[in-house]
Swiss-Prot record:
The gene is ndhH. InterPro entries: NADH_Q_OxRdtase_suD, NADH_UbQ_OxRdtase_49kDa_CS, NDH1_su_D/H, NiFe-Hase_large. GO terms for cellular component: organellar chromatophore thylakoid membrane; plasma membrane; plastid. It comes from the Eukaryota. It comes from Paulinella chromatophora. This is NAD(P)H-quinone oxidoreductase subunit H, organellar chromatophore. Belongs to the complex I 49 kDa subunit family.
Length: 406
């Protein structure tokens, strides 16, 4: 008996740009052969707002309020790279206390970023309960931000060229320490619910595998790179801010699949807690609301009086632990030159390339968004996957379209 050969025509379907699993206004044009993905074309640009051109018409200080809208889940990192790049171009050293405060904000933002990734990712693969748990912890982080900056999610506008906008309020360090003590067991709770859940593991293990060579060749960064066997973290590599003062480990894995990327982000939250706890104990000046009032600063003090009062307050004889009157800089005239500056955000390497011609505004301001680069590998790892796995693989990348489109 002869068998009839059946052939199926390729089917082209659109995911997004308004699908709830798209994590923003992302459109995927997917070509299917039955249930197998043959090709995928990401269509971006729906959220483009010309952030680079806006930066070229603003000074460094006046541009800081805009940057929270790149990656609106990690606004502190956007502010950090904006001021760090300007400080590096100006050869400006910031007070030690300000650097510690920045680290506190950045690590809180890293935890908030991973929590916001974890909940929707699990919802994408069918686990609804943890989606509601993560908002409980994120609200506590927002409370801490609100106490310092007055804002919760975005528009913190807290980082400044040369330091931060204001000192920590009275009692904030104690509240942050309470959060660290409370959040540690919650990570264990997540792992009990998720990590060894057989349904969850069978759903994502082996999906979206990226080898070590592929991760390097595609210029991946962050958890996407570290989950593929490359222990690369800019906090260790570039030694920016005061990360060298703390004892912590790089979270990485070798498998390169969706499950490995999940494990890396869970471990990164633990390491962020380690950094936070150490920074809370080691911060110069201690838990104070007003350093000037605590040290008895007066406008008639001489330089010797100022140095003596600073040494009394910090317990140090010398050193730039904190500075009430920092080095005077002309923010209306940025030094001529060009440089590339980068920080390790929750999604990977967030960089800025600046070209300055000596005027107040930069001549060129190029943003290197981590999730924009990470998204480029999506068609490669989707080819050959099932249509039901598209959302799981996309979710493991962790993209925010405000950052991708800029």
């Amino acid at each position: 008996m002869t068998q009839l050969e059946t052939r199926t025509e390729p089917m082209i379907i659109n995911f997004g740009p308004h699908h709830p699993s798209m994590h923003g206004v992302l459109r995927l044009v997917v070509t299917l052969d039955g249930e197998d993905v043959v090709d995928c074309e990401p269509v971006i640009g729906y959220l483009h707002r010309g952030m680079e051109k806006i930066a070229e018409s603003r000074t460094a200080i006046t541009f800081v309020p805009y940057v929270s809208r790149w990656d609106y889940a990690a606004g502190m990192f956007n502010e950090a790279i904006t001021v760090n790049a300007t400080e590096k171009l100006m050869d400006l050293e910031i007070p030690r206390r300000a650097s510690y405060i920045r680290v506190l904000m950045l690590e809180l933002n890293r935890i908030a970023n991973h929590l916001l990734w974890l909940g929707p990712f699990l919802a994408d693969v069918g686990a609804q309960t943890p989606f509601f748990y993560i908002f409980r912890e994120r609200e506590m982080i927002y409370d801490l931000w609100e106490a310092v900056t007055g804002q919760r999610l975005i528009n913190n506008n807290y980082f400044r060229v040369g330091g931060v906008a204001c000192d920590l309020p009275f009692g904030w360090l104690d509240k942050c320490e309470d959060f660290c003590d409370w959040f540690g067991p919650k990570i264990d709770e997540y792992e009990q619910l998720i990590t060894n859940n057989p349904i969850f593991r069978r759903r994502i293990e082996g999906l979206g595998v990226i080898s070590r060579e592929q991760a390097i060749n595609w210029s991946l960064s962050g958890p996407m790179l570290r989950a593929s066997g490359v222990p690369w973290d800019l906090r260790k590599v570039d030694h920016y801010e005061c990360y060298d003062d703390f004892d912590w480990d790089i979270a990485w894995a070798k498998e390169g699949d969706c499950y490995a990327r999940y494990l890396v982000r869970i471990e990164e939250m633990r390491q962020s807690l380690r950094i936070l706890k150490q920074a809370l104990k080691m911060i110069p000046g201690g838990p104070t609301e007003n350093l000037e009032a605590q040290c008895g600063f007066d406008s008639t003090d001489t330089n010797q009086d100022l140095d003596k009062k600073r040494s009394v307050a910090t317990g140090e004889v010398s050193g730039n632990e904190y500075t009430i009157g920092p080095k005077k800089i002309n923010l209306n005239k940025c030094p001529e030159g060009e440089l590339y500056c980068r920080v390790e955000s929750g999604k990977g390497e967030l960089g800025v390339f600046i070209i300055s011609n000596g005027e107040a505004n930069p001549w060129r301001w190029k943003i290197r968004a981590a999730d924009f680069n990470n998204l480029q590998i999506l068609p490669h790892i989707l080819t050959g996957a099932k249509v039901a796995d598209v959302m799981a693989i996309l979710g493991s990348i962790d993209v925010i379209m405000g950052s991708v489109d800029r």
